[in-house]
Amino acid sequence: MRALVIDDSRTMRRIIVGVLRSLGFDTLEAADGREALDVLESGVQVDLACIDWNMPVMNGLEFVLAARANREWRDVTLMMVTTESEHGQIVRALAAGAHEYLIKPFTADAIREKLQLLGLVEWEVSA
């Protein structure tokens, strides 16, 4: 599986990439929504996009709307990973087409659990 991490913070991208790689994902990075659309437009297959909300050029909500408007990208799972914690913002993102919403700061376990709920990571069965 391949994930696209979209965040204007290089440090945050590294953190999320590290978690995703530990879960078996190949990763790509983009610093804003426009750069992320360029990745998708290049034809690279992406299974998951982890999206920050507050970015220059094109913010996360604009990216979600653009991704959902293109039939070729409808199978990409979109997960917001952002500091935006107001209920209205969460509702807007989910209504726009995001599948899941994770508020920063987060733990690696929180990302894993969200991906398990989305069916992208297998549930661990304890013996």
Where are the predicted features?
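Charged docking surfaces used in two-component/phosphorelay signaling
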Residues: 14-22
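Short hydrophobic/Thr-rich beta-strand motif most characteristic of the beta2 strand and flanking loop
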Residues: 24-31, 39
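Receiver (REC) domain active-site loop signature in two-component systems and cognate sites
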Residues: 55
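C-terminal output helix
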Residues: 106-115
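Active-site beta3 strand of CheY-like receiver
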Residues: 44-50
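Short, glycine/charged-rich "phosphate-handling" switch motifs in NTP-dependent
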Residues: 99
